[in-house]
Amino acid sequence: RINTTNNMKIFLDTADTQLIRKYYGTGLIDGVTTNPTLIMRSGRDPEEVYQEIEDIGLRDISMEVMGDSNEMIEEGIRLATKFPNSATIKVPCTPDGLLACAELSMKNLIRVNVTLIFDVAQAILSAKAGAAYVSPFVGRLDDNSIAGLQLIKDIDEVYRVQAIHRTRILSASIRYVNSVSQSFANGADIVTMPPAVFDKMYNHVLTDRGLEIFDEDWKKTQEIISKSA
């Protein structure tokens, strides 16, 4: 399977706009995923959160809709109309969710993220329904003694064999830095993660020790220079 964008993408999984603003400033964040739980924790109106994220500069914000297929379609169209530059409508991988996905993506040309993917079969149905993204829940599978990263690999293999290029794999429910690198290694196009995990991607004990050594040696060099002056 060919990654047509020739690059990996990193999304933040949060509705905390202060953290989004902070990490967007790194130039390394490509999008944001939200869900009802994250919105509830923010204590804010969902659309206020979406608007602020868009104002920060993000152009790919997963906005989850709930209800039956008609309700999800109606709400998805409304959100995509209100946020035409950033909305990705997020639906669950259920019969109603996939009906909504097909209507939104194929008839209304709206970007859809099908979430709560726990099996390759669900990823196949989502691709058939025109999903822009499928979101396998790596961490939640691992919690239940099922190899979440293997699911990423299996979905990628099916998509590659069937030449499915439109639907991209968005690895979700990430708990550890290693899951980020392994998601990409196993075929994910995008990984969404909590800000705390993104922050830890910078850190390694050997990097920290190397910086300490460089700092110590730099100070010694400065002392030598000052003595010889």
Task: List each language-model region with its residue ranges.
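Active-site beta->alpha loop and helix N-cap motifs at the rims of alpha/beta catalytic domains
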Residues: 9-21, 26-28, 33-103, 138
